[in-house]
Amino acid sequence: MSDTRRRVKVYTLNEDRQWDDRGTGHVSSTYVEELKGMSLLVRAESDGSLLLESKINPNTAYQKQQDTLIVWSEAENYDLALSFQEKAGCDEIWEKICQVQGKDPSVEVTQDLIDESEEERFEEMPETSHLIDLPTCELNKLEEIADLVTSVLSSPIRREKLALALENEGYIKKLLQLFQACENLENTEGLHHLYEIIRGILFLNKATLFEVMFSDECIMDVVGCLEYDPALAQPKRHREFLTKTAKFKEVIPITDSELRQKIHQTYRVQYIQDIILPTPSVFEENFLSTLTSFIFFNKVEIVSMLQEDEKFLSEVFAQLTDEATDDDKRRELVNFFKEFCAFSQTLQPQNRDAFFKTLAKLGILPALEIVMGMDDLQVRSAATDIFSYLVEFSPSMVREFVMQEAQQSDDDILLINVVIEQMICDTDPELGGAVQLMGLLRTLIDPENMLATTNKTEKSEFLNFFYNHCMHVLTAPLLTNTSEDKCEKDFFLKHYRYSWSFICTPSHSHSHSTPSSSISQDNIVGSNKNNTICPDNYQTAQLLALILELLTFCVEHHTYHIKNYIMNKDLLRRVLVLMNSKHTFLALCALRFMRRIIGLKDEFYNRYITKGNLFEPVINALLDNGTRYNLLNSAVIELFEFIRVEDIKSLTAHIVENFYKALESIEYVQTFKGLKTKYEQEKDRQNQKLNSVPSILRSNRFRRDAKALEEDEEMWFNEDEEEEGKAVVAPVEKPKPEDDFPDNYEKFMETKKAKESEDKENLPKRTSPGGFKFTFSHSASAANGTNSKSVVAQIPPATSNGSSSKTTNLPTSVTATKGSLVGLVDYPDDEEEDEEEESSPRKRPRLGS
């Protein structure tokens, strides 16, 4: 079995007319009892399994191509090919086939290819007409030759006969000599005939003729003939392009003359197929199948020859990563690898596997890491294309590399972070490169293509790595654009070397403080677009949309990793700031992110949304949209309709209790009335359950109802305030063992809110940078403010003179003197009014009219 003469690759032709590699093995010709005849057997060299068992049928047409290929059809749509490593092995098997069929081994085709209709005509032909008589190859016979070649294309038998005649008489070379004569004489008519003749010969679809036409001696004259299309007023200049414009660049000198010749030939034949020949019609699409196969096998041979020359590849990698290599040389090296990887796509999976393993062993990923960070746009673009080939073929290989790299390098220079940086820094106004890189990142973080073995799980390991080392880089533009912290923004811009225009800048101060008896128009819901950072630069908005698309993908596929991240960063609140963008597509991306979260129907997320009052920006957007019937309107309505249909009780109660007054006027859909109905039905059910319990069990002594629990919760937060004197997260319940709430979320929010409260003593309190709240007031005039879209909850005044009008420790804290609502933070200076809170008739404010 070690005999390399018999070593072959087995190919089958698929529905797309592409050759599929079925494996490598050793071929033999033996008698098979079951098939009752001599058969070709191919056994795999890896495990000895049978790759092919094919009886040599006496009537099957076998073709020998390029000295090392044998091609035949076993059924109407089942073509097979054996590609031999050595010519001697091909000749040996060819003799066996010819022996069975009683043919001379010198022929290239053992049978005429005929169909049933042709068989009948063939039987009627006189025996003397086995070959076609070709006219003498002279200038005055060109029209006759052209008519003959054109006429045979519709008949498989006549095509075969003409091909044999052309091959036996060396006719093609004689025709090309006539072409040179016609061109010297400027014989336009003759040149037009030669175009038809050469085009017709290509459509004969014969490999033996292609070998003559595409030889170094003939190919440029063939291209010359194809320049003179009679349909064109002026001939094309294809030869000028191939000889002068198209330059063959040897990044490293290729010493193998056969390899160099094969590269030249493949490029020129591909040019003929793609550029010169017109797109074949539906009736001609199979005429060039052999030409496609010719190019395919050439590419396979080129990749194999280069792959086996490790000295050549090692030298390429050494120069690519050498700091002394000049920019022009490095650009050529990267373009070579790009072309090399493109050629590798002709290989079948097992061969591609070996190809990419060779590149990985030589260090392709560390080399890409270097070149992707370079300033040259062409180099970065080519490196991105190479990276895409690697990711598409084996994302696990890339993931394994970056996880090993993380143990030795800083986060800033990790390959994935370099990719994210390239995505963020894309200078293309349409972000073409960023879209491509986003797709690659999505493939890398997709759990569907991650492997699970008995010893380790790639999914958990890689996602832990990604969220620890890379997620902060991905979300940095989003957090920067929804933050009022200028220092954070400056750091990010400096760190990532790019410039964004922030059209809507943060408002850190107001020209006047809001009197306790009235509310500033700026603080009314629906009128706060000037107070919120919104990335209204189009390129920035596109980038944020891409980032949100990735984060939405994470919500769907990453469960607890993204859940912890959203809580730690209060990410949904930051994302919903983008509902204020003037770019509707960005507002829709933010809404889609929230919709995916709600679509999970996870009570953990639902608590986060209700306690943070995160429906408010969505409802603001709906009200600001007014009566316009557009995609934003439909998307918001669909969000609430989903909650109604799925009967998500906690969200339904929150929406009805806090926002129904603002939404009840929307009657063109029944969504909000439906939510109110669901809420009231659930409330009735709860009351019935309560009434069915004996009165002694309803006593607070034995049963703690929701109100009692809420009072205990407030007492717990009050105690924390008295002990620590700090702002704490008021509405969030203390984590229970069964909750998934992150341990450091409360500390994170404490620190964040305490820092913000220092500078905002006299300002309207806000729940988070860029956040905004429904405005509450004791003033009836404020409740009926000038903005018809404002939503104002009415809270009964705690005192008649208004001297002490603050209400603390509500699920949504109310501070009338400061003219704004604080959602998550209780301030220490509110402690003195705890007693007044106890006398308040309601714990959760209801929306007024």
UniProtKB/Swiss-Prot annotation:
Protein location: Cytoplasm; Cytoplasm, Cytoskeleton, Microtubule organizing center, Centrosome; Nucleus
GO aspect biological process, one term: regulation of double-strand break repair
Tissue distribution: Moderately expressed in tissues and specific brain regions examined.
Keyword Phosphoprotein: yes
Compositional bias annotation for Polar residues: 776-818
A matching Pfam family: PP4R3
Keyword Phosphoprotein listed: yes
Reported function: Regulatory subunit of serine/threonine-protein phosphatase 4 (PP4). May regulate the activity of PPP4C at centrosomal microtubule organizing centers.
Family: Belongs to the SMEK family.
The name this protein goes by in its record: Serine/threonine-protein phosphatase 4 regulatory subunit 3B
Protein's organism: Homo sapiens
Gene name for this UniProt entry: PPP4R3B
